[in-house]
């Protein structure tokens, strides 16, 4: 079964790069540039196995989106990315049970390894 990943970030270059790497690893990918767009995907059917989410988004933080997802009993795993780490964000991410926390910039192989550790291999990999 092909695992699904939603990438949420307003930096289009990052979205394209991460999408490409995860597609190559065999994951089904969707992308959103804001929390509002992400919600349209997240509450759809079937659910995503994983959400890779930037904390700094237009109008709303990634932490705020995670809070709503957890309140709505969304079971997707979450990797929170941030270039602006603060003790408050890190603490809130832990409280909301964010599965992984990545500081930007990060090595793409680290991201792929984290994705695999959380939801397993992609399946249907073009890489073989």
Regions found by a protein language model. Give the residues of each.
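Alpha4 helix (beta4-alpha4-beta5 surface) of REC/receiver domains from two-component response regulators
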Residues: 64, 85-100
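The feature encodes the CheY-like receiver
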Residues: 15, 58, 86
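Acidic catalytic/metal-coordinating carboxylates
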Residues: 33-34, 61-64
């Amino acid at each position: 079964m092909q695992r699904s990943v939603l990438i949420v970030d307003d930096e289009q270059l990052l979205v394209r790069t991460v999408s490409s790497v995860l597609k190559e690893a065999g994951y089904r990918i969707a992308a959103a540039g804001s929390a509002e767009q992400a919600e349209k995907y997240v509450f759809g059917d079937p659910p995503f196995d994983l959400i890779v989410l930037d904390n700094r988004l237009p109008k709303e933080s990634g932490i705020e989106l995670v809070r709503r997802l957890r309140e709505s009993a969304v079971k997707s795993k979450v990797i929170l990315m941030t270039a602006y780490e603060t003790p408050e964000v890190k603490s809130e991410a832990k409280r909301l049970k964010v599965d992984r926390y990545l500081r930007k910039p990060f090595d793409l192989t680290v991201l792929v390894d984290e994705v695999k550790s959380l939801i397993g291999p992609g399946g249907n990999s073009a890489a073989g």
